[in-house]
C-alpha cells in the first residue's frame, strides 16, 4: 500500500460513540471538556448524540443509532475524510449484537490513521495534547494510487 500526507485541521471533526453502559461516562467526559469541545465539529451516533446535546448544549450532528448502522456510518465518514478523531467509550464487559460493526469501525480508524480514545483517560490525553487544536500531518492510504495499480491488474 502506498501512502500520502493528509493534514488533520486545527478544528477537528470528532465522532463521539458510546455503548449503553458507557453513555454516562462519555457525557461526564464531555462536560469536563466542554470548552475544548466547543471549538470542534462534533458528531455522534443517535442516542449518544441526543443525550450529549440535551445535557451539555453542545451542537452535535446526530447519526444513526449504533445497532442500526451508526458505527458503520461513522466508519464510512472516516473513509471519506470527514472524521478526524474518534472517541469511542465501548463496554468491554458487555457483548453487543453489533460487535462485528465495532471491530470494523476500529479497523477503519486504524487504516485511515485517525486517533482513537476508548476510555476517559485516553480521551483526556487527546484533549491535553497540543495536537488537539493544531493542524497535524498524518499518512493515509493513497487510494488513487491503489486504484490505478488495481486497474493495471497488480
UniProtKB/Swiss-Prot annotation:
PROSITE patterns: METHYLGLYOXAL_SYNTH, MGS
Residues the record lists as binding substrate: 19, 23, 45-48, 65-66, 98
Record domain MGS-like: where: 6-154
Alphabetized GO MF terms: methylglyoxal synthase activity
Active site annotation, chain numbering: 71 (proton donor/acceptor)
Disulphide-bonded residues: none
A GO cellular component entry from the record: cytosol
Reaction equations catalysed: dihydroxyacetone phosphate = methylglyoxal + phosphate
Domain of life: Bacteria
EC code: 4.2.3.3
Keyword set, alphabetical order: Lyase
Record keyword Cell division present: no
One of the Pfam families matching this protein, by short name: MGS
InterPro entries linked: Methylgl_synth (IPR004363), Methylglyoxal_synth_AS (IPR018148), MGS-like_dom (IPR011607), MGS-like_dom_sf (IPR036914)
Keyword check for Lyase: yes
Entry's Gene Ontology BP terms: methylglyoxal biosynthetic process
Protein role: Catalyzes the formation of methylglyoxal from dihydroxyacetone phosphate.
Similarity-based family: Belongs to the methylglyoxal synthase family.
UniProt protein name: Methylglyoxal synthase
Species per Swiss-Prot/TrEMBL record: Cellvibrio japonicus (strain Ueda107) (Pseudomonas fluorescens subsp. cellulosa)
Lineage of source species: Bacteria, Pseudomonadati, Pseudomonadota, Gammaproteobacteria, Cellvibrionales
Gene: mgsA
Amino acid at each position: 500500500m502506498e501512502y500520502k500526507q493528509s493534514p488533520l485541521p486545527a478544528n477537528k471533526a470528532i465522532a463521539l460513540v458510546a455503548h449503553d453502559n458507557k453513555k454516562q461516562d462519555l457525557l461526564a467526559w464531555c462536560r469536563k471538556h466542554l470548552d475544548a469541545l466547543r471549538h470542534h465539529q462534533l458528531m455522534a451516533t443517535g442516542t449518544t448524540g441526543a443525550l450529549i446535546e440535551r445535557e451539555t448544549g453542545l451542537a452535535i450532528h446526530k447519526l444513526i443509532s449504533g445497532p442500526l448502522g451508526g458505527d458503520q456510518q461513522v466508519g464510512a465518514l472516516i473513509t471519506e475524510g470527514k472524521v478526524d478523531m474518534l472517541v469511542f467509550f465501548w463496554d468491554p464487559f458487555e457483548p453487543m449484537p453489533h460487535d462485528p460493526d465495532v471491530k470494523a469501525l476500529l479497523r477503519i480508524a486504524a487504516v485511515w490513521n485517525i486517533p482513537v480514545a476508548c476510555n476517559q483517560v485516553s480521551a483526556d490525553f487527546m484533549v491535553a495534547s497540543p495536537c488537539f487544536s493544531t493542524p497535524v500531518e498524518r499518512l493515509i492510504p493513497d487510494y488513487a494510487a491503489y486504484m490505478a495499480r488495481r486497474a493495471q491488474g497488480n
